[in-house]
Amino acid sequence: MSHLVKMENGQSQTIQEMLGCIERYNPDHLKTLEAYVQDQAKNNTYDLEANLAVLKLYQFNPHMLNFDITYTILLKCLTNLPHTDFVMAKCLLLPQQMKDENVQTIIDLADILERADFTLFWQRAEVNRNMFRHITGFHDSIRKFVSHVIGTTFQTIRKDLLKELLGGIEDSTLESWVKRNGWKHQGQGLVVVATQDDKIKTKNITEKIEFENVGALMAQCL
C-alpha cells in the first residue's frame, strides 16, 4: 500500500520524499506515518527511518502519543536484530513511554535476546504472545537472529537443543531452517553448523611504506 503525504500547497509526496525535508517534523503527517507503521506490521516490511520519525514526532508532540504504535515500532526493531535499531528507538522514548508496563516488557525481551538466553525468550514470548500477534513474520524474524548467533557460536549442535533455541519447533520446521542456513545433519542427533573449512582464515598482509611517506612525521619528532 502506497502512503502519500499531502502538503500545504496541495501537492502530494511519498513518505520517503517527506522524510528527506523539513516536513518530517510536521505533526500533520503523524497519522499517515502511524498508518505506515501498521502496514509494516501487517505486510512484514520495515522502514526504520519512518519509524524513528514517528517517535521523534511524539517527543515534540507528547499529547499525540500513541502507545500501540510505540509497541509496534519497538517490536519491529527487534525483528531486525543484530542491528542496533532497538537502541536508537529506545533513546527516543519519552519518560511516560519508558514507565509503561508493555514498553518495559518489550525492553526486557530485547535484553534477553541480546544476552542470547533464547529459551527464556520463547517462554516470555509465549506469555506475551498477544502483544505481537499482529506483527506478521515476528517469530521467523527472531529465529533468523537466533540462527545468526548459533552460526557464530557453534560448530555442531544437538538437534534437540537447536529445536529448543529456535522456539520449540517441530521436526518439519527444523528441516526448513537447516536447509535455509546451509547446515547439515551429521547423525547421532547432531547438526553441523560450521565445518573447519568455514572458519575464517587469518592472513598476513605486508604493506610497503616508502620513506617519503613518513619523512615529514619523523621530522616533527626530532
UniProtKB/Swiss-Prot annotation:
Name by which UniProt lists this protein: Eukaryotic translation initiation factor 3 subunit K
Family of the protein in this entry: Belongs to the eIF-3 subunit K family.
Signal peptide range: none
Record bears the keyword Transmembrane helix: no
Organism for this UniProt entry: Drosophila ananassae
Stored PROSITE patterns: PCI
Record text on subunit structure and interactions: Component of the eukaryotic translation initiation factor 3 (eIF-3) complex. The eIF-3 complex interacts with pix.
Pfam families in the record: CSN8_PSD8_EIF3K
GO MF, one annotated term: ribosome binding
